[in-house]
C-alpha cells in the first residue's frame, strides 16, 4: 500500500473534462506533498467523492503554483482533521472567485502554515468556512505575504492576520 502521492499530478495540464474517479484510491495516504503543484486544472475540476484525505498528515506544497479552476470542488470527503503541515499549500496559486473550502477543512491541529498563501492571487471572494482557524502557537510566518486581492496587494502588516484576510474575502 502506498503512503504517499507526492508529486503525482505536478506540473501538468489536466485535459478538459478530467475527473478523479472512483478507482483512484487515496485511503491510507499520509503524504500529499506537491500532489497538484504547478497543475493547470480544467474548469469544474473536482476531487470527487472518493478522494480520501482523513489520514493525511502532510499537505505541504499540495497546490503550490497551481491554477485552481473556476468552479473547483474539493469533493464531499476532503478532510484535513489530521493534517499538521500546510506549509506553502496554496502558495503562488491563482484562486478563483467563489472558492469554498469544504466543511471538513479543519485546521485547529495544524502546526505549520508558513507561507500557506504566499504570493497567491485571490480573484474574488473565498469562503474559508468555520473549521479554518489558526491555533495559538501555529507557525504563520508570511502566511499571506505579497498576496493579491484582485489588483490590490495585501498590506504586509496583515501578512499573518487570518481574521483580516477572511473578512476581506467574505
Residue positions per predicted region:
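Negatively charged
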Residues: 1-170
